[in-house]
């Protein structure tokens, strides 16, 4: 909730953009709105560390899907790994939007590492164009995994439980990073990098 319940939705960057009138009663936000370096550094570095911590967890799921594939049925394997790959692309995209360059101006600027493993090794900064390519690779891999197995494609948004004692893992798919959300992120990333044809095709 600290990311999507605030920092990446309505809070930190909207305050920095002066969308809100923060008075003295809201001391933390007022400091942020006046570009107080301590307040800004805490919010922004918190975003960076939180996202990369989440990426370790996501990569652990991706690795476990392949290492323990025999314990998952085919539907679970494809949906869980597909969602995790999409989430990896999404988390990198959020950091990319905040810390990356203006893509249309300088796509060759080194801006951030791309985390594809659960180990804690320090990775080199990559060019924005390389980060964009890796994100699209993750989204495309997720799309391939989900397209035959995500229940949302054939059954739509299932809002009811399966029934007493039955698992609900494959219902409420409209609240998850499902097949259509992945396609939307492919289009969004393509627009962000200026590839309108790829965005339209998505």
Which residue ranges define each predicted feature?
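Conserved, well-structured interaction surfaces
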Residues: 27-99, 121-130, 144-146
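Extended ligand-binding groove/face enriched in aromatic
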Residues: 90-118, 137
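Acidic, glycine-rich segments characteristic of secretory precursors and extracytoplasmic regions
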Residues: 1-14
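Short coil/turn linking the two alpha-helices of tandem helical-hairpin repeats
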Residues: 96-103, 150, 192-195
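Flexible helix-coil transition and linker loops at the boundaries of alpha-helical arrays
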Residues: 67-76, 145-173
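Carbohydrate-binding/catalytic loop surfaces
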Residues: 17-18, 110-120, 157-174
């Amino acid at each position: 909730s600290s990311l999507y319940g605030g920092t990446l939705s309505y809070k930190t960057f909207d305050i920095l953009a002066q969308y809100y009138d923060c008075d003295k009663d809201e001391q933390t936000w007022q400091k942020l709105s006046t570009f107080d370096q301590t307040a800004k550094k805490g919010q922004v570095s918190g975003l960076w560390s939180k996202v990369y911590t989440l990426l370790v967890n996501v990569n652990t799921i991706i690795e476990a899907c392949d290492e323990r594939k025999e314990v998952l049925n085919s539907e679970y394997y494809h949906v869980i790994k597909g969602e995790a790959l999409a989430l990896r692309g999404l988390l990198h995209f959020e950091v990319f939007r905040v810390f990356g360059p203006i893509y249309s101006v300088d796509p060759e600027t080194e801006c951030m590492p791309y985390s594809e493993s659960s180990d804690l090794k320090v990775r080199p900064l990559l060019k924005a164009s390389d980060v964009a390519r890796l994100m699209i690779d993750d989204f495309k891999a997720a799309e391939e995994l989900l397209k035959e197995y995500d229940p949302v494609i054939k059954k739509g948004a299932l809002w009811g439980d399966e029934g007493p004692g039955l698992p609900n893992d494959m219902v409420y798919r409209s609240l998850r990073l499902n097949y259509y959300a992945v396609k939307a992120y492919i289009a969004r990333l393509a627009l962000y990098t200026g590839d309108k044809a790829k965005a339209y095709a998505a």
